[in-house]
């Protein structure tokens, strides 16, 4: 789910600053001209980038850009609100958050480039195939047992528990396949965006450092809810399996890439 940014009941258009960033990133990316033409950019509510669709699909892709990609001088921090805070003193308790939310142009370009490459319809199709297979398998297994009259003599409660167990197995299998697949995709697109050039690599490192810094500050400002959302390192908290690659891992990937490139003789 995403939310378009509206102002005066109209969709807020991209500012000249953001349009300039998008133009530079599209110029640097390796997509074909027709693929670039399938991308649409819009303002999105929140502080995270968003993407959907694919440049390799007939419908194209969409990328949502948060307000923090605007020129910091144009942002009215007085109108920003945190959940559980009617107001926030941006000069005192919010100063560190402002610093964490403020990105250089290189960091913004890395984020945009990563989202552009992430607009791949095959990732969506892979997820659809995985989910279909993981839930069809237990369904077919249960149908076969019913057809062979294997479990029909069991009490209703026992049969119900067995059905639930079968589909729970399918869900666990789905997560065990889907999550690592998403992690691999995240690594691939992070690296692809970073190798665009030295500025993108440096921007990527800053991008993830700032996200970790932001999450740690939000953990403190949001109190108990913040502790449930983020750990002490700034990674998002998940129960058991992690659907997203931890931010710390993504940062370390780029830092290792930077070390490898520096080790290569000029």
Predicted regions and their residues:
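Long, contiguous hydrophobic alpha-helical segments, chiefly transmembrane helices and signal peptides
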Residues: 63-65, 69, 110-120, 129, ...
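Active-site-proximal gating segments in proteases and membrane effectors
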Residues: 44-59, 194-266
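Hydrophobic faces of alpha-helical transmembrane segments in multi-pass integral membrane proteins
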Residues: 113, 134, 138, 165-169
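Short helix/loop segments within enzyme catalytic domains
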Residues: 11-37, 146-225
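Post-HEXXH active-site segment of zinc metalloproteases
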Residues: 122-150, 207-214
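Peri-catalytic and regulatory segments of divalent metal-dependent proteins
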Residues: 1-116, 120-121
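Polar/charged alpha-helical tracts
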Residues: 16-27, 99, 152-153, 232, ...
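Structural motif marking the loop-to-transmembrane transition
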Residues: 105, 121-129, 153, 157, ...
